[in-house]
């Protein structure tokens, strides 16, 4: 091992700034994985050959010929090395669901950032199955199933996508898509948290720091009610107590927030109804049929009293089954003329909070019909037996009208072609206001002339009604409180010391505050190597100025893992969150990542990690990171597998010598399973307490830690979560009884059902000590000492005695 000639080939021959920038670029389409479950092995073999020959796709088949956990281990350990290889990867799973369930395979696929397709219930001649398989071949190396999610919402309209393309902003669109995926995952993670902590359904409310419209939609997809908290709200400029009656819709107002909304333009009521469902769990829906836009929502705990002459018992049953809501369908017209709670079964909501959605119209004398509705709703607001939270009424008045209790009069997103508005009634609405027909006509002329994006963006006026104005850093952090603070609390208007104090208090209070922020050192590294980012970025220490292609400019503070760990927070990746929440996740997936998104990291409180996440299974594993970066760099440099491990042995040898350990006390092996053998007992002084090595034991330093240190230069790397898991699993642990054993395929399990330890404390801390030398070797001295330093500092905090 001491032979000085043992240095060829090496990494310095190949790795330069261009190599590093190329790795950043590859990350945009990393994990091109599709996990495809079907019941027909011969069909899998046929299409495996087709897609491999046509597009060079790496194909794996799990067919039951090998015990399932062993098969999963071999397959996904192999895939872990291929995730940055630029080639599509397809795994066909043909074993029965009783062997490996849909839920387990979905968790595994998403843990590796893949697309998941379940068709084991389809016959061999099923048109759906054949179509999906044909698409697999024809679309390769892409696939038309999103990664890490059941649905996908891309460009709102084709003209908007065309505008982006002609203005060289298509990369930014991928950034927005992934940002929306991120927000969706954060919501799904909160839903998982609510389930695990058994939070009552009526208390499942999440506070969202910083406005972004899709949170309303994605919260209702997960059975959660959202509220926003903002430091201030721009004056809408309209009439009424909150300025929401015909608010100003000039460009300045509309472009003040994000334009992108992930809604299907064919589902015009989605914006309105998800907002209204956020205001109460008791809903009177008048003119409900067909309400297909509600079928993808999760409404467990909601009660919906639906009126429509077209309603059938089948419709009622289907709506209840799809959404989980208690649905009472009434197949008749609502009686607006009878000023009685009993007449329309509203007595069932006595002493309850109720919101009302009206989507009714008639062909004859629509003006008179609207007047009847208005009078009824004004009357209903004044009832004391029912706490009416909010009423939305379809509004197409053609005459001047006096209105009571009117809180807002807003254009209907997606409703320009039918010149439709919505009136909102509330106890705090204007007591008596005149709405002029000519004024609303002119207003709708202006609205119709706007772009579709700007029309959709007017939903922000609705969301003002579920927004609290205040300082998020002063909110109560009682146990069970859920807060999403992504792309928000890191804003430069919030001093870092206050943010860190707030997060520390949240951890101590056992609240669930999910925090997202730019990663200071990764961003600095990207700029240092000359990476061209999707957003123009300037840095002054940890103050970052962003300017994106849509014209927005803002400033954030960057944060590091070590300072957040000091505050009681642990980094977790979006991939880990979506895999961990896969049993409840009902959000969107994505197709392409962006370098901009990889500059951010997300953190959760340490109390939750210690309670729920110390037992590592594939959902919480960094398996999608630990092999692919080192394998890519090693292959680029043609460094043999054996040589790579011998290099690691040399680095350990140098470190031990630097600590005055006599070389006769150990024997360097430098293999994949053994770094060195301890010949005689010795100890190494360390800030976490002495590292103790007993005679006649083998030491295998943590390759995961070293690989994560390389990955951390390019993408979010959950080093501290992994270190917490290693500390907990430094001894054998029994398999948890409530989890499928297949999720632990990457672990070694003893005959008694215990998970064998991953590494000793010494093996982890020794790896941390050579981490910078290792990164310097792998990246030819073009590594970031700051990234390595903060990781090492945080790991030492985890293991400090």
Swiss-Prot record:
Coiled-coil positions: none
Got a GO cellular component term for this one?
Answer: host cell cytoplasm
The record ties this protein, via InterPro entries, to:
P5_Phytoreov
| EC number(s) on file | 2.7.7.50
Q: Would I find Transmembrane helix among this entry's keywords?
A: no
- GO biological process: what's one of them? 7-methylguanosine mRNA capping
- Please name the pathway: mRNA processing; mRNA capping
Which major enzyme category is it?
transferase
Bilayer-crossing residues are: none
- Record's keyword terms, sorted: GTP-binding, Host cytoplasm, mRNA capping, mRNA processing, Nucleotide-binding, Nucleotidyltransferase, RNA-binding, Transferase, Virion
Principal location: virion
Kindly list the places in or outside the cell where this protein is found, as annotated in its UniProt entry. Virion; Host cytoplasm
Q: Name one GO molecular function term.
A: RNA binding
Task: From the UniProt record, list the reaction(s) this protein catalyses.
Answer: a 5'-end diphospho-ribonucleoside in mRNA + GTP + H(+) = a 5'-end (5'-triphosphoguanosine)-ribonucleoside in mRNA + diphosphate
| Functional note | Enzyme involved in mRNA capping (Potential). Binds to GTP and might have guanylyltransferase activity. Together with the RNA-directed RNA polymerase P1 and protein P7, forms an transcriptional complex positioned near the channels situated at each of the five-fold vertices of the core.
Please report which protein family the annotation says this sequence is part of: Belongs to the phytoreovirus protein P5 family.
Task: Please identify the protein, giving its name as recorded.
Answer: Putative mRNA-capping enzyme P5
Q: Which organism is it from?
A: Rice dwarf virus (isolate Akita) (RDV)
């Amino acid at each position: 091992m001491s032979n000085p000639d043992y240095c060829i080939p090496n990494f310095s021959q190949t790795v330069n700034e261009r190599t590093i920038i190329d790795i950043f670029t590859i990350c945009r389409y990393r994990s091109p994985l599709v996990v495809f479950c079907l019941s027909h092995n011969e069909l899998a073999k046929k299409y495996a050959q087709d897609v491999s020959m046509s597009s060079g796709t790496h194909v794996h088949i799990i067919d039951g010929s090998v015990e399932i956990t062993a098969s999963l281990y071999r397959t996904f350990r192999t895939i872990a090395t291929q995730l940055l290889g630029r080639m599509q990867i397809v795994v066909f799973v043909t074993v029965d669901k009783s062997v490996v369930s849909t839920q387990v395979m979905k968790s595994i696929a998403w843990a590796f950032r893949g697309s998941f397709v379940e068709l084991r219930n389809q016959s061999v001649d099923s048109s759906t199955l054949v179509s999906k398989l044909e698409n697999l071949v024809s679309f390769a190396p892409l696939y038309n199933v999103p990664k890490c999610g059941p649905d996908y919402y891309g460009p709102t309209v084709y003209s908007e996508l065309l505008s982006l393309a002609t203005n060289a902003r298509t990369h930014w669109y991928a950034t927005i898509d992934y940002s929306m995926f991120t927000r969706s995952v954060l919501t799904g993670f909160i839903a998982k948290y609510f389930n695990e902590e058994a939070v009552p359904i009526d208390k499942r409310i999440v506070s969202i720091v910083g406005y972004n419209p899709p949170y309303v939609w994605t919260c209702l997809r997960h059975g959660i009610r959202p509220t926003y908290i903002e430091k201030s709200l721009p004056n809408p400029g309209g009439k009424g107590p909150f300025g929401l009656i015909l608010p100003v819709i000039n460009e300045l107002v509309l472009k003040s927030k994000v334009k992108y909304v992930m809604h299907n333009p064919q589902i015009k009521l989605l914006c309105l109804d998800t907002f209204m469902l956020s205001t109460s769990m008791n809903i009177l829906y008048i003119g409900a049929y067909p309400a297909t836009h509600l079928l993808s929502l999760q409404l467990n705990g909601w009660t919906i009293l639906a009126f429509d002459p077209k309603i059938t018992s089948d419709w009622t049953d289907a709506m209840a089954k799809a959404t989980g809501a208690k649905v009472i369908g009434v197949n008749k017209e609502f009686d607006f003329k009878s000023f009685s709670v009993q007449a329309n079964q509203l007595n069932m909501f006595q002493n309850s909070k109720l919101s009302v959605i009206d989507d009714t119209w008639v062909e004859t004398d629509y003006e008179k019909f609207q007047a009847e509705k208005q009078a009824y709703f004004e009357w209903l607001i004044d009832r004391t037996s029912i706490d009416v939270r909010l009423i939305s009424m379809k509004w197409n008045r053609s005459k001047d009208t006096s209105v009571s209790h009117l809180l807002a009069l807003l254009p209907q997103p997606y409703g320009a072609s039918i010149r439709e508005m919505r009136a909102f009634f509330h106890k705090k609405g204007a007591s008596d206001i005149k709405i002029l027909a000519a004024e609303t006509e002119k207003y709708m002329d202006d609205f119709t002339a706007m772009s579709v994006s700007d029309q959709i963006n007017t939903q922000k006026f609705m969301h003002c009604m579920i927004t609290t104005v205040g300082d998020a850093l002063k909110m109560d952090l009682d146990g069970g409180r859920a807060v999403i603070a992504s792309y928000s609390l890191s804003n430069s208007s919030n001093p870092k010391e206050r943010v860190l104090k707030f997060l520390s208090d949240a951890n101590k209070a056992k609240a669930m505050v999910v925090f997202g922020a730019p990663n200071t050192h990764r961003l600095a590294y990207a700029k240092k190597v000359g990476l061209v980012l999707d957003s123009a970025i300037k840095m002054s220490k940890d103050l970052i100025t962003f300017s994106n292609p849509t014209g927005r400019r803002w400033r954030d503070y960057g944060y590091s893992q070590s300072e957040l760990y000091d505050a009681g927070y642990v980094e977790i990746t979006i991939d880990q969150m979506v895999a961990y929440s896969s049993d409840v996740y009902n959000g969107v997936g994505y197709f392409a990542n962006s370098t901009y998104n990889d500059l951010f990291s997300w953190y959760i409180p340490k109390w939750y990690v210690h309670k729920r996440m110390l037992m590592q299974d594939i959902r919480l594993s960094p398996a999608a990171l630990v092999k692919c970066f080192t394998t890519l760099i090693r292959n680029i440099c043609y460094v043999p597998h054996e040589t790579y491990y011998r290099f690691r042995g040399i680095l350990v040898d140098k470190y031990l010598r630097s600590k005055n350990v006599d070389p006769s006390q150990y024997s360097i092996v430098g293999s994949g399973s053994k770094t060195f053998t301890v010949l005689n007992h010795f100890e190494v002084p360390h800030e976490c307490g002495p590292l103790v090595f007993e005679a006649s034991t083998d030491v295998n330093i943590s390759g995961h830690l070293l690989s994560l240190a390389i990955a951390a230069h390019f993408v979010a790397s959950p080093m501290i979560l992994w270190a917490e898991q290693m500390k907990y699993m430094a001894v054998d642990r029994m398999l948890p009884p409530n989890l499928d054993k297949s999720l632990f395929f990457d672990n070694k399990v003893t005959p008694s059902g215990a998970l064998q330890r991953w590494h000793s404390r010494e093996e982890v801390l020794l790896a941390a000590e050579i981490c910078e030398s290792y990164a310097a070797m792998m990246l030819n001295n073009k590594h970031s000492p700051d990234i390595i330093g903060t990781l090492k500092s945080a790991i030492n905090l985890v293991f400090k005695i």
